[in-house]
Amino acid sequence: MASSMLSSAAVVTSPAQATMVAPFTGLKSSSAFPVTRKANNDITSIVSNGGRVSCMKVWPPVGKKKFETLSYLPDLTEVELGKEVDYLLRNKWIPCVEFELEHGFVYREHGSTPGYYDGRYWTMWKLPLFGCTDSAQVLKEVQECKTEYPNAFIRIIGFDNNRQVQCISFIAYKPPSFTGA
């Protein structure tokens, strides 16, 4: 029924047009594109991300325990800790103070499975600081924890309660008895 409704003008065909572009026949040989190469094999002349930059060692592989974020830096001062907590609060993360009395780093004691480490879970100091708006409140809690447990490692974590993940974690205090090995 639909075919009977077509007009005769719609069915008219036009003759094939001659194409203006030659059909694709594949890639041309490399001999058509002359390439000149530098004979200089000097590494400083190669374009790269850092060929002329003196490389620096970031992490010593032996004799230094790895803690949390920023663990490759020297210990943070009170002012630097305050700035990190301000960053945490600006991102609307919930600050929480945790401490560990024995091992302030991941270690392997109870399992040999790849990816399994002990020492990832620390004891929470009080409750997370829900509604905290000032870094001084968090640093006050760190100071109280330090007074209560002077031989404990203390860290500050930032928890995103929308995504339900820990977003940042860094060491706020290392005990004086810790030698760094």
Swiss-Prot record:
PANTHER family found in the cross-reference section: RIBULOSE BISPHOSPHATE CARBOXYLASE SMALL CHAIN 1, CHLOROPLASTIC (PTHR31262), RIBULOSE BISPHOSPHATE CARBOXYLASE SMALL SUBUNIT 1A, CHLOROPLASTIC-RELATED (PTHR31262:SF10)
Family statement drawn from the similarity comment of this UniProt entry: Belongs to the RuBisCO small chain family.
Domain of life from the UniProt record: Eukaryota
Ranges annotated as spanning the membrane: none
Compartments (UniProt record): Plastid, Chloroplast
GO molecular function: ribulose-bisphosphate carboxylase activity
Name recorded for this polypeptide: Ribulose bisphosphate carboxylase small subunit, chloroplastic 1
UniProt miscellaneous comment: The basic functional RuBisCO is composed of a large chain homodimer in a 'head-to-tail' conformation. In form I RuBisCO this homodimer is arranged in a barrel-like tetramer with the small subunits forming a tetrameric 'cap' on each end of the 'barrel'.
Organism in which the protein naturally occurs: Brassica napus (Rape)
Transit peptide: 1-54
Keywords: Calvin cycle, Carbon dioxide fixation, Chloroplast, Photorespiration, Photosynthesis, Plastid, Transit peptide
Cross-referenced CDD domains: RuBisCO_small (cd03527)
InterPro entries documented for this protein: RuBisCO_ssu (IPR024681), RuBisCO_ssu_dom (IPR000894), RuBisCO_ssu_N (IPR024680), RuBisCO_ssu_sf (IPR036385)
Keyword Nuclease attached: no
Listed GO CC annotations: chloroplast
SUPFAM superfamilies documented for this protein: RuBisCO, small subunit
